[in-house]
Amino acid sequence: MARTVFCEYLKKEAEGLDFQLYPGELGKRIFDSVSKQAWGEWIKKQTMLVNEKKLNMMNAEHRKLLEQEMVNFLFEGKDVHIEGYVPPSN
């Protein structure tokens, strides 16, 4: 049976992650309160950020920037701003 969490991003009950994907206290918070769907949406944004800003995950400052963007996106309701990106209209 799938594990459910109250997703802070979606603001509703949803299927939770299968295991902790991120280390430390933040990883535990993500595991406890972010759904698979929300994590998938974050991964898309993360990929765009890494590519557009040419982030290098070997660089501690770049990792810190990406982590802050992740917290803003998943827990504070702030969308990721990517220069020149216009989301498709439905």
UniProtKB/Swiss-Prot annotation:
Family membership noted in the UniProt record: Belongs to the Fe(2+)-trafficking protein family.
Role played: Could be a mediator in iron transactions between iron acquisition and iron-requiring processes, such as synthesis and/or repair of Fe-S clusters in biosynthetic enzymes.
Pfam families in UniProt: Iron_traffic (PF04362)
Species the sequence originates in: Haemophilus influenzae (strain ATCC 51907 / DSM 11121 / KW20 / Rd)
GO biological process: cellular response to oxidative stress
Cited PANTHER family: FE(2+)-TRAFFICKING PROTEIN-RELATED
A molecular function (GO) term: iron ion binding
Keywords annotated in UniProt: Iron
GO cellular component term of the entry, any: cytosol
UniProt-recorded name of the protein: Probable Fe(2+)-trafficking protein
